[in-house]
């Protein structure tokens, strides 16, 4: 036998987040969670296989309340009530079918719903034998049609009433199969039968309760909650009730699967995707291998806000891991305003492993595209996903990963198929630079029109009228006689009235004169940067200044003449002056010359024009960070101005900004080449995968590229281990320690100073790199700073680098390169042009600290029968040094002269090649040497950094050498030389131990050869001196 249980709906429940749980013997199942409603509609079917109908077997339907505690799990908070139906009562019905009946939910014995009316639930049950295996589906269809079309009168009563009336008091109904086939012919019989049932139940009730059985009430209840309606009619109904008051739902937590713009209106795209029997859905099902696709009709849920809903079922094709499974989609319109649509889809797959523990959620959002397009109306489709777990499981991570991968592959096919029908719009197509510029410049204002608007004021009109009036008066009057203190050529006022009139006329004419001069100056100041094309190749910044709104002057009563100054990478561009305009309309295009590296910040400031030599009062300013805006956002940006009066007036500027690279990959290579000269170290271009991960981690635009990354500790109250990232425009840090994430970045331009602090006990013997930001800069990274000084400067401490010296030098060099002024950069380029440096060392020379010296190994020591000054001639750069080095196997030996960097400290550089006796690979060598007096003037200490080129793994390490040449005897005629050596690894390799051993042996032998040659050459020179 098979038991079919249909849980249709409930009403008047005391909670809004509910679901029904079904128990039949040892079998259990449950419905989906109905959200935000106390009258849920489930319309779900459950089938159980039972061996026999016993007296003690009951069907128990429990209604439970669920509460969502976080984004991933849902925990039940209490039992609302139960309904218990004996199977024997169902078997005693005609055709063993209990038609849809309202049951009163029994109150629980404990919990928070004990003394509350728990509502009612509409159920239908049917028992089918093996010979009627296909009748279950027919019964379900019968019940749904009865609910929607005919219905039954509400049967109000507890299950106990049903038990007491099961002997000889059964309700008589027509067979559902005949109702489905002949529903129209049997309407009268059905109503007649219902009246007989109602009368008989009223007369024969053994417990004295009045039990009604008219299914029309049930029909009314169901119809008020779910009404069959057409798709377009339902959308019109939702649109009429939407009234733009419902907000568009946020994207689901799992992430965005599709975010694409299409050249089609939102309404047409919505119909194309969700209309019944959509051809697109059929083609997609065929492409994805779906079968037995059954789309239910769109029905209207009559809640506080009417919502269209339907159920779609299909079979997913079998894969290598999972067999063919049935999936059920519940699609609900969350918003339909005519221009914006949101469809929420809940997908249940109970047949997959752990399928009863989770449901996949999808959210389709269709939005109108506000940007101008060349092809007409456009829309944006965003599809996000999430997963809801009804119970916890240890396979949660694996389920999420599998769902993410499967959805990604499915919606790639979805996007590709949709793109065959509607043209997709790239961001560059949506807002094409040339098109926008052409639009901005299409309606330029003439000077005549600007002059008319400027001079059309009361003061100018009064001055003109009064001047005309005086001139006409003069033409009609005879010349006055000379009297008083007048003389020929001087006519004075003869009364106070004449004096007053003359004064007014003079003041008005003065005002007109000042306005005229101001207008001429503004015209001369106009557009000196407007329309000037950018020069060179590199990063081109183009700004279309559209308009300003609600600009406020320092003096509220005065009119002002605004103009805008743009500053980027030390260069400025100025717009034209708009005379006496609170809402100026510029429509101007300004371009900056090509830049070698992408700019970080654009400073915008609005001034009140006050003559050609004065800057004027500021009306507001703003800073646009290119790293915090996408290309789409920059293409249509409304900038809020900052300032006392600007913020109070909500002043804004509308800009369209385009940043593009005119030189392609060569721009990046040129930038790296310039940085390498400053850093003194080879910088490799990172892989696209690393660059993409870096951009995604910090939300950076695609043009930002990674230069270096280092593992280190960020020092705060407790050190935090993470990675320090260096890119062309930012310094970034990221850490994830047991799920606690620390992430921030700041601009190179925000750095005020970088200091290297000596090791301390608190830093575990590691030097500290201190980065201090400028005042009130980098406030977004404040949570990563260790302290903030009295001036408002943030301090960041980094420690425990693998190679502290190389890291600190690289960071210092990048900072200096980025913060150099434009003129200084040009000067450096001119000086370095066409100059090759054979002594270029991958790292700059540095003093080996005492702490580093303690870690160096002594590889050679010798006593020399000569004083310290003679020994130091080995490094003197003279003929003796050249002979020794050539005989020891150095070819093309060249050295610079010793230069004093600071008192007592001298530096020089060397360049040579090894012959094949010294190294089978040959290879070049560059060295940097630094010498300084030893303590107490006992001799000299010379530090040397050696870089090997054109040898295997030569770029993975550097050799640090320290020579200590000191006095050995009391008479100062003998000396002692000790040589220490250390290998500093820049990159980790498996052959470190082998290479270190080889270098130690080679250099030990080399030092012996050099000092033996020195003793021979010194003895020979002494003999020649004696002769």
UniProtKB/Swiss-Prot annotation:
GO terms for cellular component: membrane. InterPro entries: At1g03370/At5g50170-like, C2_dom, C2_domain_sf, GRAM, PH-like_dom_sf, VASt. It is a single-pass membrane protein. Residues 168-177 have a biased composition (Basic residues). Residues 158-167 have a biased composition (Basic and acidic residues). Residues 253-426, 855-1018 form the VASt domain. Residues 1-103, 516-639 form the C2 domain. It is found in: Membrane. Residues 158-177, 201-223 are annotated as: Disordered. CDD domains: C2 (cd00030). Residues 693-756 form the GRAM domain. The chain crosses the membrane at residues 452-472. Keywords: Membrane, Repeat, Transmembrane, Transmembrane helix. The keyword Transmembrane helix applies. Residues 206-223 have a biased composition (Polar residues). This is C2 and GRAM domain-containing protein At5g50170.
């Amino acid at each position: 036998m098979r038991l079919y249980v249909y849980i249709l709906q409930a009403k008047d429940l005391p909670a809004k987040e509910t679901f029904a749980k079904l128990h039949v013997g040892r079998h259990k199942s449950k419905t989906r969670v109905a959200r935000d409603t106390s009258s849920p509609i489930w319309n779900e079917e459950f089938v159980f296989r039972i061996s026999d109908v016993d007296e003690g077997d009951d069907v128990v339907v429990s209604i439970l309340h669920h509460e969502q505690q976080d984004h991933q799990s849902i925990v039940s908070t209490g039992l609302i009530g139960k309904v218990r139906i004996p199977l024997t009562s169902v078997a005693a019905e005609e055709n063993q079918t209990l038609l849809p009946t309202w049951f009163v939910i029994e109150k629980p014995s404990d919990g928070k719903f004990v003394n509350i009316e728990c509502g009612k639930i509409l159920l239908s049950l049917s028992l089918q034998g093996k010979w009627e295996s296909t009748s279950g589906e027919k019964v379900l269809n019968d019940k749904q049609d009865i609910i929607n079309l005919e219905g039954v009168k509400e049967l109000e009563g507890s299950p106990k009433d049903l038990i007491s009336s099961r002997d000889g008091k059964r309700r008589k109904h027509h067979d559902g199969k005949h109702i489905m086939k002949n529903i129209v012919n049997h309407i009268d019989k059905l109503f007649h039968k219902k009246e007989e049932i109602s009368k008989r139940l009223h007369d024969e009730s053994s417990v004295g309760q009045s039990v009604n059985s008219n299914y029309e009430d049930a029909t009314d209840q169901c119809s008020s909650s779910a009404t069959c309606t057409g798709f377009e009619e339902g959308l019109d109904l939702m649109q009429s009730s939407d009234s733009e008051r419902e907000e568009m739902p946020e994207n689901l937590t799992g992430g965005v699967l599709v975010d694409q713009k299409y050249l089609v209106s939102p309404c047409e795209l919505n119909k194309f995707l969700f209309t019944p029997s959509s051809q697109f859905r059929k083609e997609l099902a065929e492409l994805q291998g779906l079968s037995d696709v059954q789309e239910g009709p769109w029905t209207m849920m009559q809640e506080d806000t009417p919502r269209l809903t339907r159920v779609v079922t299909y079979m997913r094709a079998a894969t290598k891991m999972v067999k063919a499974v049935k999936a059920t989609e519940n699609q609900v319109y969350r918003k339909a305003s005519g221009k914006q649509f949101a469809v929420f889809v809940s997908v249940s797959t109970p047949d997959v492993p752990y399928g009863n523990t989770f449901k996949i959620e999808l959210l389709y959002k269709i939005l109108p595209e506000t940007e101008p397009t060349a092809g007409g109306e456009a829309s944006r489709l965003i599809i996000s996903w999430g997963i809801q777990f009804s119970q916890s499981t240890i396979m949660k991570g694996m389920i999420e990963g599998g769902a993410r991968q499967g959805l990604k592959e499915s919606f790639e096919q979805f996007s590709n198929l949709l793109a065959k029908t509607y043209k997709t719009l790239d961001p560059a197509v949506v807002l094409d630079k040339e098109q926008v510029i052409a639009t901005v410049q299409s309606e330029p204002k003439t000077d005549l029109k600007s002059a008319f608007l400027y001079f059309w004021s009361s003061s100018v009109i009064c001055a003109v009228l009064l001047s005309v009036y005086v001139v006409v008066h003069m033409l009609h009057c005879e010349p006055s006689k000379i009297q008083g203190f007048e003389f020929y050529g001087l006519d004075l006022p003869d009364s106070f009235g004449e004096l007053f009139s003359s004064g007014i006329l003079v003041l008005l004419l003065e005002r007109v004169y000042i306005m005229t001069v101001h207008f001429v100056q503004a015209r001369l100041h106009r557009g000196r940067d407007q329309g000037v094309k950018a020069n060179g190749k590199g990063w081109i910044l183009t700004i279309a200044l559209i308009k300003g709104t609600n600009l406020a002057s320092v003096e509220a009563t005065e009119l002002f003449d605004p103009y805008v100054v743009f500053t980027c990478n030390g260069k400025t561009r100025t717009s034209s002056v708009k005379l006496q305009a609170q809402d100026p309309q510029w429509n101007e295009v300004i371009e900056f010359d090509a830049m070698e590296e992408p700019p970080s910040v654009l400073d915008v400031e609005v001034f009140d024009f006050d003559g050609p030599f004065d800057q004027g009062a500021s009306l507001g300013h703003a800073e646009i960070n290119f790293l915090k805006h996408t290309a789409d956002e920059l293409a249509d940006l409304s900038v809020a101005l900052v300032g006392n009066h600007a913020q109070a007036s909500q002043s804004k500027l509308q800009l369209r900004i385009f940043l593009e690279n005119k030189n392609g990959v060569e721009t990046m290579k040129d930038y790296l080449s310039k940085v390498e000269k400053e850093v003194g170290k080879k910088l490799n271009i990172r892989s696209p995968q690393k660059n993409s991960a870096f951009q995604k981690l910090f939300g950076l635009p695609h043009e930002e590229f990674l230069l270096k990354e280092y593992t280190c500790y960020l020092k705060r109250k407790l050190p935090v281990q993470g990675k320090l990232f260096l890119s062309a425009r930012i310094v970034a840090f990221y850490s994830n320690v047991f799920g606690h994430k620390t992430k921030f970045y700041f601009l190179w331009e925000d750095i005020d100073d970088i200091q290297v602090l000596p090791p301390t006990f608190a830093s575990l013997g590691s030097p500290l790199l201190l980065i201090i930001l400028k005042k009130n800069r980098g406030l977004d990274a404040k949570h990563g700073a260790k302290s903030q000084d009295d001036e408002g400067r943030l301090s960041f401490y980094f420690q425990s680098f693998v190679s502290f010296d190389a890291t600190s030098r690289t960071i210092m060099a990048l900072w200096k390169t980025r913060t150099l002024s434009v003129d200084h950069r040009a000067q450096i380029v001119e000086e370095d042009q066409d100059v090759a440096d054979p002594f270029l060392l991958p790292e700059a020379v540095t003093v080996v600290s005492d702490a580093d010296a303690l870690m160096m190994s002594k590889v050679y020591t010798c006593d020399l029968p000569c004083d310290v000054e003679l020994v130091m001639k080995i490094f003197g750069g003279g003929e003796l040094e050249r002979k020794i080095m050539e005989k020891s196997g150095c070819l093309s030996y060249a050295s610079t002269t010793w230069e004093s960097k600071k008192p007592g400290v001298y530096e020089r550089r060397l360049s040579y090649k090894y012959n094949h006796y010294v190294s089978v690979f040959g290879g070049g060598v560059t060295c940097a040497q630094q010498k300084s007096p030893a303590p107490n003037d006992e001799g000299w200490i010379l530090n040397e950094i050696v870089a090997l080129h054109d040898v295997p793994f030569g770029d993975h390490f550097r050799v640090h050498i320290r020579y200590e040449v000191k006095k050995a005897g009391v008479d100062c005629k003998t000396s002692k030389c000790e040589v220490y050596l250390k290998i500093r690894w820049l990159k980790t390799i498996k052959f470190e131990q082998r290479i270190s051993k080889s270098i130690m042996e080679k250099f030990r032998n080399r030092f012996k050869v050099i000092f033996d040659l020195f003793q021979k050459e010194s003895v020979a020179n002494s003999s020649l001196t004696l002769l």
